[in-house]
Amino acid sequence: MMRTCVLLSAVLWCLTGVQCPRFTLFNKKGFIYGKTGQPDKIYVELHQNSPVLICMDFKLSKKEIVDPTYLWIGPNEKTLTGNNRINITETGQLMVKDFLEPLSGLYTCTLSYKTVKAETQEEKTVKKRYDFMVFAYREPDYSYQMAVRFTTRSCIGRYNDVFFRVLKKILDSLISDLSCHVIEPSYKCHSVEIPEHGLIHELFIAFQVNPFAPGWKGACNGSVDCEDTTNHNILQARDRIEDFFRSQAYIFYHNFNKTLPAMHFVDHSLQVVRLDSCRPGFGKNERLHSNCASCCVVCSPATFSPDVNVTCQTCVSVLTYGAKSCPQTSNKNQQYED
């Protein structure tokens, strides 16, 4: 890091002449009891197992039940039976393995049992229905919008362009081993009047740090879901760049005897804002999914998301969960090309 900082310093002198489950988020050991009335919304991370859905309410689970039977109906109103993905126990507990987008939807269980009067042995059949709304979700992909400022001798002259290209190259080299890169870099030169210092010229530089550099999939080690890896990498990339600019201020104020070149980093000018994006077929909706507001939740029927936006768009002809396109719509997501 220090070597890179010194390299930039030399360039500057040369150019100037001198990261617990929430209410309905559960891990593999979670258990959710049924409720009558409005169904709970349950969020299951993509490719993970769902929590165990229990076909009775908590109060009833503490009582003796005679001759219980359980009937589970899944999305698309299909009767569910045990298979390699759906696990249903003899006591009516359901778990879905390796949860995918199309498995989202309404899960309904009907519990039938008998009450028996001790005096007359009279039997009465009781039925109760429990609804569970289950949604696939995935963590958002992180990127960072950054802005910094550098003083410059003048807003006229090619050395500003040269410095800008050198800075981008240095930043890319800092984070290339993390499969991250700098995108959408830009700068403008402004005249800034500072009290007691008069008028100076500054470069206002902006760029985005993105975790999807060419070949980024190689860092996933073959995993189906790579958000954990890419988000971990982008956090490291953010930290390295922040350390780099902090080191710039340190070098100038401690290694150059208080004499700064005409072009230098403006201390405390670094601004960092996290940007979230969702993969195609997923989006954020704080109103509909308040218990998973920061999640990228699968797009519901009648909506779709073709790109990395965080909003599911309306498309009345879509009948499935996780739609990435709408009939007669052809949007292509470029960010995730390898």
Swiss-Prot record:
Record's keyword annotation contains RNA-binding: no
Record-linked Pfam families: EGF_Sp38_C (PF20626), Sp38 (PF07354)
Carbohydrate-modified residues: N87, N221, N257, N309
Signal peptide (UniProt feature, chain positions): 1-20
GO biological process terms, semicolon-separated: acrosome assembly; binding of sperm to zona pellucida; circadian regulation of gene expression; membrane lipid catabolic process; negative regulation of immunoglobulin production; sphingolipid metabolic process
An annotated GO cellular component: extracellular region
Keywords recorded for this protein, A-Z: Cytoplasmic vesicle, Glycoprotein, Secreted, Signal
Keyword Magnesium: no
PTM notes: N-glycosylated.
Subcellular location: Cytoplasmic vesicle, Secretory vesicle, Acrosome; Secreted
Tissue expression from the record: Expressed specifically in testis.
Function text: Is implicated in sperm-oocyte interaction during fertilization.
Record family assignment: Belongs to the zona pellucida-binding protein Sp38 family.
Protein name as catalogued: Zona pellucida-binding protein 2
Gene source species: Homo sapiens (Human)
Gene: ZPBP2
